Amino acid sequence: MLVLSELKGLTSGQRNAFVASFLGWTLDAFDFFLMSFTLGAIAKDFQVEVTEVAFAITLTLACRPVGAFIFGRLADRFGRRPVLMVDILLFAVLEIASAFAPNLTIFLVLRGLFGIAMGGEWGIGSSLTFESIPERARGAVSGILQEGYACGFLLASVVNWALFEVIGWRGMFIVGVVPALLVIYIRMFVEESPVWQKGEHAKAKLNFFAAMRGHWKLAAYVIVLMTAFNFFSHGTQDLYPQFLRTTHHFDNGTVSLLTIVGNVGAIVGGVMFGAWSERLGRRKAIIFASLLALPVLPLWAFAQTPILLGLGAFLMQISVQGAWGIIPTHLNELSPDAVRGTFPGLMYQLGNLFAAVNATFQVWLATRYDDNYAIPLALVTGVVAIVIVILAAVGVEKKGVVFGSTESA
């Protein structure tokens, strides 16, 4: 009820900014997670090992900070709205180009470029949203906005279930051009950030490093926090379909269904903990959500039946995406005004860079245990859940800060 009341209180302009950012992140994640469902098919087509194709995930994640910096600085200088449109169009074009890659080398190059484009969307979209909405709505909106990622994974699961056997992996990537249509919606209905319009962009003419003076300690903390968070999400999601196929030998329909169940849990967790963070505070909500992963871990990784695995997936993603649902508002509140188009996205994506080895590491470790993916998935998830609890406990927050004020400078 709290979430609905906050959404109803938004003006049409505020809702449009939120919807555009949510859909942008949803479709961004949709394009990214098509890889998770097609690793085996791509490897077979290119006649290489799955570990070689899995490097495309690592490469995409590693390139995202480049996009976060480039598009973030452009958004700080020229506005959130136009740069968001260019960025969405670019990652849609690169997704469809991936469908026509003639070999693994070209495919990897295109996935790296896709990572640059993907890296720009989250930071720009979140800054546009949180600079547009009232302070009281930040927690509720944050939980929904971040779960655009889970919705994208869910959408990829449905497309995999419905179309993969018919159109193959190349056809799946062609479907990934759909995000380009969102540009039309943004062009027609979305307004520029009021904070940016009030003149905050003038500060962005400063060199980024000059604007960050006095904030480097904060930046270092956030990068470490986001590294742990990215291990948390990618460690439970990227190779989960491969875990179901290889370790449990489930068919495509069962894999899709269990992935869908997990993503429903992710949406529930993100919305629930995002809203609760308005009452509990950002750090306490992150701690509670992360701790939930520990008792769920044995069920999620080591259950043997589809029903129990589905229950484990649902509960695990409530935990993982419950913690993640707080991140958009948390990072935007911590960000200095002059670099809000850059700071949240860059910190997030630098965390992605340092966590980019996750997929390659988990595949490598699974091969050491006769392709038993349960062990690497459980190991990564358990360790990083504890690390996140510690980092949140010793960290800072600025819940309720007024953007454009001296406190937010």
What is the predicted role of each segment?
Residues 1-30:
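Cytosolic juxtamembrane N-terminal segment immediately preceding the first transmembrane helix
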Residues 145-187:
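Helix-loop-helix hairpin linking two adjacent transmembrane segments in secondary transporters
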Residues 66-102, 280:
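Conserved MFS/SLC helix-loop-helix module at the cytosolic interface between two early adjacent transmembrane helices
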Residues 36-66, 253:
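Extracellular/periplasmic helix-loop-helix junction of adjacent transmembrane segments
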Residues 277-327:
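C-terminal transmembrane helical hairpin of 12-TM major facilitator-type secondary transporters
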Residues 110-147:
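Cytoplasmic helix-loop-helix junction between adjacent transmembrane helices
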Residues 35-36, 216-267, 355-359:
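Extracytoplasmic gate region of multi-pass secondary transporters
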Residues 47, 79, 100-106, 134, ...:
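Helix-breaking motifs and short loop linkers at transmembrane-helix boundaries and internal kinks
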